[in-house]
């Protein structure tokens, strides 16, 4: 390429540990040599979040709102051990949760499929796209330890000054325990429904919403009712025209049905269910390192793409000791490619769109040609049978991808 592609504005969020190392390599080898970006960078590494009292996370979310495209590296969500390790001021909330709560919308996760990576669930021949409602429930809950005997109650105080309504949660008679209050909002559930129906129509696949409305009759029942109402009013005729269906399923029934299916559907999950099932589905396709994750906001134009896995702490500890690592960068690369593809769509930028697709194609073609990281070699041969010659280390694999991308773009004569 004789000149760089003009890419426009992108918010990038740096992360933690091994994924932070990989993130810099992706920019250095795969993105910045070819694309001129107006990059708005936010360091969401745990130390900087602590130093800014987590303000940097909120600032990043506001920047995504402004520029409509964000790409995020994996980050540490601290627990007690991490608070001690980094001497944190407090146990900061998940940055993903904070960003999602500011932006709203739905997280859609889809497996990246390579022909030579065997699937643990062998019947899955088509992708399953999980739409995770990225707002509220446990992720915005108030939870606490009940120190001793006493009553836990929930009170609703109407703004119009009419009478309060109090519900008894539990009377702790013989000691303490734990309690939690969580919520969701009709508007957010409606946005979730619209995003899910639109995704199903764009893919031409059926849509299933899973809840536990038999137990949470009011809470989960609200999700079921809102989805049904919106489907009947706005989407039923479009679904019928495409010969696809929408159904509500109980979560336990849906999990069983998904295992037996061949894939090829959209699965709309509440926040916690989506968190769990997206990892389960990713592993079923072969690897957690092979999963795209995109937050689509209700305005239809704001998108945040991220890796669907953690910070790969074990590999980072090895890297710190100077030991060889073989860390899979594919999900982090796809965070960039999906973000750039959306930027291209917003700006009607055909060159950037071509680049984003070329980057994804290179990842899949390189793996299918037999060049891969250790986790993927283990999927093929089984971990005990993997020899050193079967895989590339972290840096070798990134170099190989860089070499193949350079060749593909030269061939295209962009």
Swiss-Prot record:
Organism of this sequence: Mus musculus (Mouse)
Q: Which GO terms describe its biological process?
A: 2-oxoglutarate metabolic process; female gonad development; glutathione metabolic process; glyoxylate cycle; isocitrate metabolic process; NADPH regeneration; regulation of phospholipid biosynthetic process; regulation of phospholipid catabolic process
The effect annotated for residue 245 to S is: No effect on inhibition by cadmium ions
Instruction: Indicate what this protein is called per its UniProt record.
Output: Isocitrate dehydrogenase [NADP] cytoplasmic
Gene name of the encoded protein: Idh1
Could you give the cofactor binding note from the entry? Answer: Binds 1 Mg(2+) or Mn(2+) ion per subunit.
Q: What family does the entry list?
A: Belongs to the isocitrate and isopropylmalate dehydrogenases family.
| PTM annotation (Phosphoserine): residues | 389
Summarize tissue expression.
Answer: Highly expressed in the liver followed by kidney, lower expression in spleen, brain and lung.
Write down the SMART domains for this protein, in alphabetical order: Iso_dh
As for PTM, the annotation reads:
Acetylation at Lys-374 dramatically reduces catalytic activity.
Q: What function is annotated for this protein?
A: Catalyzes the NADP(+)-dependent oxidative decarboxylation of isocitrate (D-threo-isocitrate) to 2-ketoglutarate (2-oxoglutarate), which is required by other enzymes such as the phytanoyl-CoA dioxygenase. Plays a critical role in the generation of NADPH, an important cofactor in many biosynthesis pathways. May act as a corneal epithelial crystallin and may be involved in maintaining corneal epithelial transparency.
């Amino acid at each position: 390429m004789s000149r760089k592609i003009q890419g426009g504005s992108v918010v990038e969020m740096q992360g933690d540990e091994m994924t932070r190392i990989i993130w810099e390599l992706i920019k250095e080898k795969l993105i910045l040599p070819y694309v001129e970006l107006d990059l708005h960078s936010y360091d969401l590494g745990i130390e900087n979040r602590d130093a800014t009292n987590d303000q940097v996370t909120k600032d990043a979310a506001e920047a995504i709102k402004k520029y409509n495209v964000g790409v995020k590296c994996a980050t540490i969500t601290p627990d007690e051990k991490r608070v001690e390790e980094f001497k944190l001021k407090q146990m900061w909330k998940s940055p993903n949760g904070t960003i999602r709560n500011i932006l709203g919308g739905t997280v859609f996760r889809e497996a990246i499929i390579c022909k030579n990576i065997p699937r643990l669930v062998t019947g899955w021949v088509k992708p399953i796209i999980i739409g995770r409602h990225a707002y509220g429930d446990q992720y915005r809950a108030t939870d606490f330890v009940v120190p001793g005997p006493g009553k836990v109650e929930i009170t609703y105080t109407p703004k119009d000054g009419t009478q309060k309504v109090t519900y008894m949660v539990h009377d702790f008679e013989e000691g303490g325990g734990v309690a939690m209050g969580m919520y969701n909002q009709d508007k957010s559930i409606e946005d979730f429904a619209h995003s899910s129906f639109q995704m199903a129509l764009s893919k031409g696949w059926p849509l299933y919403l899973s809840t536990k409305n038999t137990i949470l009759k009011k809470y989960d029942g609200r999700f079921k009712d809102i989805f049904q109402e919106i489907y009947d009013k706005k989407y039923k005729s479009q679904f019928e025209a495409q010969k696809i269906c929408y159904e509500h399923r109980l979560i336990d029934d849906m999990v069983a049905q998904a295992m037996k299916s061949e894939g090829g559907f959209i699965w709309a999950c509440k926040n916690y269910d989506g968190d769990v099932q997206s990892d389960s589905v990713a592993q079923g396709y072969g690897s957690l390192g092979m999963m795209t994750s995109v937050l689509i906001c209700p305005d239809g134009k704001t998108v945040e793409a991220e890796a669907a896995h953690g910070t790969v702490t074990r590999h980072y500890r090895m890297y710190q000791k100077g030991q060889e690592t073989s860390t899979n960068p594919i999900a982090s690369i796809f965070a960039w490619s999906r973000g750039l593809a959306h930027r291209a769509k917003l700006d009607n930028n055909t060159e950037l769109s071509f680049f984003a697709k070329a980057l994804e194609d290179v990842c899949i073609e390189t793996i299918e040609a037999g060049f891969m990281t250790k986790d993927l070699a283990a999927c093929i041969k089984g971990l005990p049978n993997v020899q050193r010659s079967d895989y590339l280390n972290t840096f070798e694999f990134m170099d190989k991808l860089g070499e193949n991308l350079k060749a593909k773009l030269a061939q295209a004569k962009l």
